[in-house]
Amino acid sequence: MSSLISFNFLFLFSFLTSSFTASAQDPFYLNHYCPNTTTYSSNSTYSTNLRTLLSSLSSRNASYSTGFQNATAGKAPDRVTGLFLCRGDVSPEVCRNCVAFSVNQTLNLCPKVREAVFYYEQCILRYSHKNILSTAITNEGEFILSNTNTISPNQKQIDGFTSFVSSTMSEAAGKAANSSRKLYTVNTELTAYQNLYGLLQCTPDLTRADCLSCLQSSINGMALSRIGARLYWPSCTARYELYPFYNESAIETPPLPPPPPPPPPRESLVSTPPISSSSLPGKSGNSTVLVVAVVVLAVLLFIALVGYCFLAKKKKKTFDTASASEVGDDMATADSLQLDYRTIQTATNDFAESNKIGRGGFGEVYKGTFSNGKEVAVKRLSKNSRQGEAEFKTEVVVVAKLQHRNLVRLLGFSLQGEERILVYEYMPNKSLDCLLFDPTKQIQLDWMQRYNIIGGIARGILYLHQDSRLTIIHRDLKASNILLDADINPKIADFGMARIFGLDQTQDNTSRIVGTYGYMAPEYAMHGQFSMKSDVYSFGVLVLEIISGRKNSSFGESDGAQDLLTHAWRLWTNKKALDLVDPLIAENCQNSEVVRCIHIGLLCVQEDPAKRPAISTVFMMLTSNTVTLPVPRQPGFFIQCRAVKDPLDSDQSTTTKSFPASIDDESITDLYPR
């Protein structure tokens, strides 16, 4: 049995330590800066020059292969100067798409402003009426983003981590400033199982001194105690993470210096005649040499294998002995992820019924308290679950390296005999559905809290789709999988059904449809096709549920509609969108803000996946009122595909002619022909 546990752990560990690179379908919007100090009119010369400049920067002939270009249009006082800088690891095609996307959004985000900076994950676009070329700007327009987590609650460890990051990034800044592309990446060992990754870049038109000064300003402005941070100025960018967020193979490395010439042969004290082929003993001699070489090589390989097994066994002992005090710490390395089963057993009072707080995707969930007072949620795999083993591995592989304030944190896991256990941070307010759909608790969620929940879920999906080093499709986004912390901040949970997409992959097909009926996109539910747009659809359903305070499945014939989407669409087309709003918040919300969110929700649930906005666009719509929203098309109505149900309990499955499916608040684990 111990060998089986070792194998399972090594299998998981091999996934945990592998590196992935995400690719985004659309550029990931970060921020924009457009001070209203100077403006221009629509029909002015400056407006014409600006459009000429933007057209030039986004033309087919722009320098996307180098990732940098500047341009000027017009004459003073209406001259416009602009540039773009693409991240050093992106391809020319990605660079071009990012610049074009940014140009298309420019006049919406910053209308009639004479200078602006637009930050995207893959590029920066900038223009001004001032001369911005060959000039480092470090006094305005910065964008700062930091992970909320620190490496450890121990201050000594935090100080050590901060010092390491500071010295590493400062050294990298000097190397970036000295390079021809003004670019340098970091990939250095932090611990035995954790590397530190970084990327520093300046616009290539800066001098060495200006580039170094700009990057050092970025480093000094970052919260280096966090496990990830970035600070972008209009002229330079600096970022570090504990995962490989860039494509290292796409960044050119300087060629190795040529090998030194071989030393001249030393003169021998005894003259040795040259050996000719005629002096060799023949085939038997060659065979002897070959046999000896093979034997020596085999012995060396055997010794290496024995040494590797010894080290692996020695290291595994450290994995099996995680103590209760270690459990409370932030788990920054893989060796602290596997927890001692007895510690978990004690924390949950031997999985007492009184400690049970719910049921997850593949087992029951318990509240646990470790000896240091740390409260945790413990998910225990059901031994009778067909899909539990696969979902357990998926959840560990996916969640272990994800670090975001809107994703639930995995603190560890345990493999003990048949036991499969996941340990998460504890969420005192349970899940969104517990508050949103409970008539006695709905009053706790005012409009501002609901709006914050919508924005937090969007940020979490953004991270999964585009900002993580993995591209992850959740496939089961629903109210019961959105947990709420003590401050009602949302955290996406339950990744047992998630799929990891490879480089440049945008969609996939499956014959095993998993998820929750009512939240699943039509193309996925009917044909098994899933993509980022499938999660966008689920997000749209969530938005409409949060605004209305009603489940998608809570409608009956008396409502004149059989689901929430039908109801919302009818109200929208009849120009009665505000009738959708939960009466508990109707009097204390901004009508324009609520209607805009309903509009966004309907855009997300459109039947055609191509018409649904990418989550980066959704986030931009939520955070900027200057973005114009397109007219929504009719949503995908699952109701047309649903057969008449037999009278079932609320936790049973409904049956259609072609396959069984579950109702809205229960997850499907398998769909198959009857």
From Swiss-Prot:
Q: How does it sit in the membrane?
A: Single-pass membrane protein
Q: Where is this region: Disordered?
A: 254-284, 648-674
Specify the taxonomic lineage: Eukaryota, Viridiplantae, Streptophyta, Embryophyta, Tracheophyta
Q: Where is the composition biased (Pro residues)?
A: 254-266
Q: Which PANTHER family match?
A: CYSTEINE-RICH RECEPTOR-LIKE PROTEIN KINASE 10-RELATED, RECEPTOR-LIKE SERINE/THREONINE-PROTEIN KINASE SD1-8
> So what does this thing catalyse?
L-seryl-[protein] + ATP = O-phospho-L-seryl-[protein] + ADP + H(+); L-threonyl-[protein] + ATP = O-phospho-L-threonyl-[protein] + ADP + H(+)
Keyword annotations: ATP-binding, Glycoprotein, Kinase, Membrane, Nucleotide-binding, Phosphoprotein, Receptor, Repeat, Serine/threonine-protein kinase, Signal, Transferase, Transmembrane, Transmembrane helix
Q: What is this protein called?
A: Cysteine-rich receptor-like protein kinase 6
Regions of compositional bias (Polar residues) in chain numbering: 650-659
Q: List the Cytoplasmic topological domains.
A: 311-674
A single GO molecular-function term is: protein serine/threonine kinase activity
Q: Which residues lie on this side of the membrane: Extracellular?
A: 25-289
* Gene Ontology CC annotations of this record: cytosol; plasma membrane
EC number(s) stated in the UniProt entry for this protein: 2.7.11.-
Gene from which this protein is expressed: CRK6
The scientific name of the source species is Arabidopsis thaliana (Mouse-ear cress)
Carbohydrate attachment residues: 36, 43, 61, 70, 104, 178, 247, 286
What the entry lists under SMART domains is as follows: S_TKc
Q: Which residues form the Protein kinase domain?
A: 351-637
